[in-house]
Amino acid sequence: MLVPLMEAVTDTCGGKAGALGALLRAGLPVPDGFVVPFAAYLDAVRDPDLARSAGESDDLDAARRMIEARPVRAAVIDALGRALDELGDPPVAVRSSAADEDTGQASAAGQHESFLAVHGVSEVADAVRACWASLFSPRAIDYRGACGRDGRPSDDPVMAVIVQRHLDAEVSGVMFTPAGPDGATEIEASWGLGPSVVGGTVTPDAYRVAEDGSVTRTVADKRTRLDRHGTQLVIRDVPTRARERPAIDDATATRLAELGKEIAAAFGGPQDIEWAIVDGRVWILQARPVTAALPPPSSPSTASDTPAATLTGTPGSRGTVTGTARIVRGPGDFARVHPGDILVCPFTDPAWTPLLRIAAGVVTETGGVLSHAAIVAREHAIPAVLGIPNATSRLHDDTVITIDGTIGTVTAANA
């Protein structure tokens, strides 16, 4: 009923699990685990009552609620218990692996649920069910719609779920391998667990490893970190002395780049790779095709060519657009966003994906170019400028601004 992660393939376990299985078979460092395959999901949603209700309704939110309300079958719970015992009953990460996730056409970055520090068969079963239900969250439905797909529980899409040992990472991050033979590996890194980097809640250190092995880096002010405390995730303040200390040294950046090249060669193309470091050892948490190119490296603007009212951040998604600034601090502000507005926000949570379909551009206070939100902005082909401190107070609602996501600037219309 369950599939060892080493044996996972895309056809039965989804793109994320299939890639991790391939990496394990190649001898690369991936945390051990297993997969709840498509068959278990299909068995759950083919329950006659659920399938009939879903088939009679176009309300996919109702489908999500029905899945959430259904207990996981006893046979699945028994299999989960045995598999967890074989791992030694550690805290685990429970992660989505949908059929259309982590493909070369669409990343679905951050669109489905994943859970860290889950412990015990009951909690794992609940997390598996939540991953299944997340196929029908508003953000996942909207993302599939933007990609020209839809689906009901009795039809398409389908979801597998990965269960792996949880890693208490000292440093985590993301890297994009080169798009061409002379390209550079781009790496972002910060303290603690990976959601801070992929979720854009911190501005990470950025490293660029050239083909000749030379490393350039930009060290950020990494104010917070995410860590496990028991079965809870806690956000901690980073000590002052560590905030502007590089999260990794140049030798580690070079080691990551070499590992990235090995993974890209195995899959035959540029890869978006999530990684973590525990006790000095690098682990690979995810590898998927790069779906949209990064903006080209930009040269710093000089005082003579930058208007006084221009704010400068990190280029996140190329292009230039002029529109009305809309300050968005949370879901309570969503209704105020109109088509063509430029979102100005502390960071962009994956739940905000529906806004990216109507927004003309995005400005954030934190986050890196390899974060989930930046990836989705590039897939939607809307300009994004990231990591402008205090952007939500320095810019104002209803003012006209121009953002250049290729060089990383935001300028008020009257500048």
Where are each of the predicted segments found?
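N-terminal beta-alpha lobe that positions the nucleotide/phosphoryl donor
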Residues: 1-162, 170-171, 251, 264, ...
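Alpha-helix C-terminal capping segments
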Residues: 22-26, 177-182, 358, 374-381
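Conserved, mostly hydrophobic/aromatic
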Residues: 33, 274, 377
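Conserved metal-phosphate-binding beta-hairpin within the catalytic cores
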Residues: 110, 265-291
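Short beta-strand elements
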Residues: 113, 165, 174-193, 287-292
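Conserved catalytic alpha/beta cores of large enzymes that bind or transform nucleotide phosphates
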Residues: 189-270
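Acidic, glycine-rich flexible loop/linker segments
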Residues: 197, 289-292, 320-341, 346-415
